């Protein structure tokens, strides 16, 4: 306290002493006095407030301009490319409509409770992932750092997919679409179709050769693909400009990036339902295969999809919710966003299989036409007798039903010779059973289907613009999960950090736009997030339930929400979720161990994919991705457990935010100014800097030199005076 304030101090000693006695006698009344007391420092009136109710740090924190903007941000983050190209594949692969039941069960058991937990801690503590877990326990601060590392790994390759979508978007403004037909190759004597394209398909060729110009293995880098390099740069510029002011800039874009995909999906669904074969695709999709539903693999894949669909463990959920008001109903938000995510997945599944049903119908018609012509040739050659063909069937204009009848007759009559005829059954179910996911769905199967659409360039533009928006919505949350914790912890300027983060990511991301870049995308997708995020969320669950205390956390929720949350969450968080997450982690490790580490390489000579194992250095990279992602957890624990680094400056976010003022401005303590009472500081904490908004008490309290354990925080002095005072709430 400055010297010229000592007179004021003496004049107020009696009143202040009485306030201090009240403070020490009753925690609740102390909290009220703490929030309402007014002190005169340097001749100015200042009002002390609780850190939760609006400290200087909190007052400066940005906030969502509306609840709708916040909900759209969470929806945009959780609803991503996986909803469009992974959920439909899993639904088809794991029993069709029957897959929805285990998915819904696991959404209720794992998804909503853990999503609610992340929303709650972010909103209650109002910090990013690093600050939140430092608050719970400084030794567990590595959880937040691990989330940041995983977010960065994912951002590196996720934005590459946005770059691919930008490339296809830019190529969609032409008629016909460039992937509609195979290119012709001319030489001195004649013109012929490109062999690689002829052996595969026009859309497959365009993806692998024109877009990626892919190499034959991960070891053949092949140099940079300049087209994709420019698209990647454009993607990072878009992300940087949208995030440079945090939620103040991204919040405006969220309205478009979150809502536009729904407009496109609904338009696609309406258009697809008007096409031949779309109903066949939807019927095939939702025909339940109950026998598959009981397989353990189905439940494991459903749990994994629930886990990643909501963005658990990334830190983006926590970062977004940290900008909420403390009394926001985050329970409602958790349920609402979770079910919006689920219904988006179902909507995308309807669209995908309506379109694929149309595509299968087109391919099936071509198949029937070609095989009917083959049968007619056999009839002319005498290989097949005309007598076995029903008289009412005209093979020149045969229907699918009549063709299948002829096919079955020939198969019975020519049972021994039938394989040599090389006839195809041409059943639409066989085409629909060809499971496609990921880039194969978006850039090959879907693009092929759109070439048969009337006004195909328009639909192509809409589709890839939708993919860009879905990707950007998820990228906003991912980057927020990186930037917000670092800004909260190290107090750097958000604008500078965002630019550096995006620039560095673009430079590192150049490995993904080599000719072998697609293989690195596969590697990062398989190894950089799955296991690390599971470990992070398990530790989050343990930190809240067993370190902070589940009973205390439930009381915090009651105080924050204004009502007691259902005991259902108590049992889910404490018992069910940890066990299921641990089981999922073990199953994922076992599955990863049983699956040979490798990737599908495009072999130009064969014009097909071939599974290749990673080289030795590739295996080292795979292991390193997992290790580096989880390494912050043990490192931070060891550093803080054994005090290996002087953490007093707060550089490692050592300050936990207990009830009381967080002091930012240092003052000089003189004489019996050492008797100032700040509030309650955890005994695990390094000493904080003293600020000017502080309580005062009479001289005679323990001096700084007598603080417990040789520490000199005023919070320890208060602990000596009243050792039985209970820990404050979150």
UniProtKB/Swiss-Prot annotation:
Name the record gives this protein: Sodium-dependent neutral amino acid transporter B(0)AT2
One family name in Pfam for this protein: SNF
Keyword Phosphoprotein carried by entry: yes
Glycosylation sites: 276
Entry function: Functions as a sodium-dependent neutral amino acid transporter. Exhibits preference for the branched-chain amino acids, particularly leucine, valine and isoleucine and methionine. Can also transport low-affinity substrates such as alanine, phenylalanine, glutamine and pipecolic acid. Mediates the saturable, pH-sensitive and electrogenic cotransport of proline and sodium ions with a stoichiometry of 1:1. May have a role as transporter for neurotransmitter precursors into neurons. In contrast to other members of the neurotransmitter transporter family, does not appear to be chloride-dependent.
GO CC aspect terms: membrane; plasma membrane
Extracellular compartment spans: 1-70, 640-730
Residue pairs linked by disulfide bridges in the UniProt entry: none
């Amino acid at each position: 306290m400055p010297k010229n304030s000592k007179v004021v101090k003496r004049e107020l000693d009696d009143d202040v002493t009485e306030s201090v006695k009240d403070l020490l006698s009753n925690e609740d009344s102390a909290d009220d006095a703490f929030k309402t007391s007014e002190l005169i420092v340097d001749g100015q009136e200042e009002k002390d407030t609780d850190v939760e109710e609006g400290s200087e740090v909190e007052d400066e924190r940005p906030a969502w301009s509306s609840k709708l903007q916040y909900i759209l941000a969470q929806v945009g983050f959780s609803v991503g490319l996986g909803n469009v190209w992974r959920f439909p594949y899993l639904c088809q692969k794991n029993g069709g409509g029957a897959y929805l039941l285990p998915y819904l069960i696991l959404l209720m058991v794992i998804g909503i409770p853990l999503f609610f937990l992340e929303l709650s801690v972010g909103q209650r503590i109002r910090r990013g992932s690093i600050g939140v877990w430092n608050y719970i326990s400084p030794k567990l601060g590595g959880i937040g750092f691990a989330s940041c590392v995983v977010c960065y790994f994912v951002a590196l390759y996720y934005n590459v997919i946005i770059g691919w979508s930008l490339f296809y978007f830019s190529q969609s403004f032409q008629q016909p679409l460039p992937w509609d037909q195979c290119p012709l190759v001319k030489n001195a004597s004649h013109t012929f179709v490109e062999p690689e394209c002829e052996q595969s398909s026009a859309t497959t060729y365009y993806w692998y050769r024109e877009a990626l110009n892919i190499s034959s293995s991960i070891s053949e880098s092949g140099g940079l693909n300049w087209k994709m390099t420019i698209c990647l740069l454009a993607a990072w510029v878009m992300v940087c400009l949208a995030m440079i002011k945090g939620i103040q800039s991204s919040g405006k874009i969220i309205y478009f990036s979150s809502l536009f995909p729904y407009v496109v999906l609904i338009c696609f669904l309406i258009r697809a339902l008007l096409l031949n074969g779309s109903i066949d695709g939807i019927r095939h999709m939702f025909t339940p295969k109950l026998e598959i539903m009981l397989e353990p693999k189905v439940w494991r894949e459903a749990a994994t999809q629930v886990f990643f669909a909501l963005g658990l463990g990334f830190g983006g959920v926590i970062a977004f919710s940290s900008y909420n008001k403390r009394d926001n109903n985050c329970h409602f938000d958790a349920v609402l966003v979770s079910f919006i995510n689920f219904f988006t997945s179902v909507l995308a599944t309807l669209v995908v299989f309506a379109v694929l049903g149309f595509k299968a119908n087109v391919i099936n018609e071509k198949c029937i036409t070609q095989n009917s012509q083959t049968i007619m040739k056999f009839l002319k050659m005498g290989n097949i007798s005309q007598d076995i063909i029903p008289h009412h069937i005209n093979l020149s204009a045969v229907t699918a039903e009549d063709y299948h009848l002829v096919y079955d007759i020939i198969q019975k009559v020519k049972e021994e010779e039938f394989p040599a005829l090389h006839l195809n059954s041409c059943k639409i179910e066989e085409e629909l059973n060809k499971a496609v996911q990921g880039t194969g769905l978006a850039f090959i199967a879907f693009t092929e289907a759109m070439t048969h659409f009337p006004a195909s360039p328009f639909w192509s533009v809409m589709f890839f613009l939708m993919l860009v928006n879905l990707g950007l919505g998820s990228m906003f949350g991912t980057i927020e999960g990186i930037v917000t914790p670092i800004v909260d912890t190290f107090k750097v300027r958000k604008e500078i950090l965002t630019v550096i983060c995006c620039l560095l990511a673009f430079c590192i991301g150049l490995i993904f736009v080599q000719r072998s870049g697609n293989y690195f995308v596969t590697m990062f997708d398989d190894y950089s997030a799955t296991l690390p995020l599971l470990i992070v969320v398990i530790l989050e669950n343990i930190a809240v339930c067993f370190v902070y205390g589940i009973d205390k956390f439930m009381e915090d929720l009651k105080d924050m929400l204004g009502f007691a949350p259902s005991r259902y969450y108590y049992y889910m968080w404490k018992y069910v979720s940890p066990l299921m997450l641990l089981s999922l982690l073990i199953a994922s490790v076992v599955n990863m161990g049983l699956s040979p580490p490798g990737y599908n390489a495009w072999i130009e000579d064969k014009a097909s994919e071939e599974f290749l194992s990673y080289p030795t250095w590739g295996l080292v990279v795979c292991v390193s991705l997992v290790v580096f992602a989880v390494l912050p957890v043990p490192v931070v624990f060891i550093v803080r457990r054994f005090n290996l680094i002087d953490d007093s400056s707060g550089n490692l976010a050592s300050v936990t935010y207990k009830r009381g003022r967080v002091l930012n401005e240092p003052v000089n303590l003189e004489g019996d100014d050492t008797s100032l009472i700040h509030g309650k500081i955890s005994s695990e904490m390094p000493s904080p800097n003293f600020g000017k908004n502080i309580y005062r008490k009479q001289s005679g309290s323990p001096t700084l030199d007598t603080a417990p354990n040789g520490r000199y925080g005023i919070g320890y002095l208060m602990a000596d005076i009243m050792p039985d005072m209970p820990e404050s709430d979150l």
